[in-house]
Amino acid sequence: MSLITELAQAARKASRKLATLGTDSKNQVLSAMSDALRANQESILAANARDLQAARANSLSEAMLDRLALTPARINAMADGIDTIVSLADPVGQRRELGTRPNGIKVSKLRVPLGVVCMIYEARPNVTADAGALCFKSGNAVILRGGKEALDSSMAIADVLQQVLRLFNLPEALITVVPDPDRALMLELLQQRDDIDLVIPRGGEGLINFVTDNSKIPVIQHFKGVCHLYVDRSADVEKALNLLLNGKTQRTGVCNALEGLLVHKDIAPVWLPIAAQALADKGVKINCDAASAAYFEQATVLAEHQFGEEYLRLEIAIRQVDCLDRAMDHIARFGSHHTEVICTEDLQAAVRFQQGVDAAVVMANASSRFSDGSELGLGAEIGIATTKLHAYGPMGLDALTTEKYLVNGAGQVRA
């Protein structure tokens, strides 16, 4: 039996044990995991230092290095995320009554775990803790296949979580990291449809496409974040500037950072000079259409096909539009169904934008950086789904469960 088959079968067996574990017991384990992460920071940081050293030697991008790096504050944030998950309602076991049929049978639906989730991600060691805890609370076993860049960090975090599982006499296979980053093993993992119920890839376009093209298991894509801010003709100048700077410069290497700016032509002469100075002060590189270039000391004029890039750095694409519909057309063509924002004082424009834009999260007068499970009240998220089945947007506990029908009768038979 191969390593991958062994891991998948062990996870399936472990998931059956977890499915019957009560909420109080799960919360006890999770609280212990949170404490253990804080207590074992030294070993986790040492493993992360090895990953960072190798990543720098391999000239990993600044955005990837930012995602890879752990600090005491980030480890505490992982632990805090688990504490939040403890405080959330357990969806498993929730029952929804559908009524009694004319023949007397009673129909209801019961929320149950998916079973075994496979998480495939790149240089994001925090995903190991977030996904492990979310899957555990929602009753699922999880197989974690992180990128080679974060392997030592992911193994160190998983080791801490598995120590807690052993302490509570639970199988380690509930949270497993694939110990070898060989892509051939990932391909084998994607064939395990008898033992894995769902694959969730988080990473760059190449990884997402590889998983989607090669998986025999259902996939929920967590695709790139080409997020736009549209500054409407009625926008408040200061609000729009704050949304732009927070969305673009607070943290550039994340999927909910702004990559595109659309400005109504009527407000451009007033607002773009202010935005240009603020972006210059932050060192943001400007790419734009010809109509906007005059507002910037240095700018690269883009051809039509060059819009829609995910920069993940201090760089942005800017375009003027003559109406709300043109802004929505641009987003439909170049957006990635992640997060889109309008800044406007016109309620009708906000409603049209939020109803008409096809994205997992559509915001009015709020920063794109709020497109995050913890900020939206879900606790630590397993990712932001950009496909519509079976979840769309930040995925919390409920998205890691499904429903089955329960039918109760008194001996009725079908005529």
Regions found by a protein language model. Give the residues of each.
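NAD(P)-dependent aldehyde/semialdehyde dehydrogenase
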Residues: K265-S367
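ALDH superfamily catalytic-core signature
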Residues: S2, A123-N126, D130-S138, V160, ...
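N-terminal Rossmann-like NAD(P)+-binding subdomain of aldehyde/semialdehyde dehydrogenases
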Residues: M1-V107
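Flexible, glycine/charged-enriched surface loops at secondary-structure junctions
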Residues: T23-N27, F168-I175, T252-L258, K285-A291, ...
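Rossmann-like NAD(P) dinucleotide-binding subdomain of oxidoreductase/dehydrogenase enzymes
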Residues: S87, R95-S234, E238
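C-terminal core of ALDH-fold dehydrogenases
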Residues: Q28, D329-R414
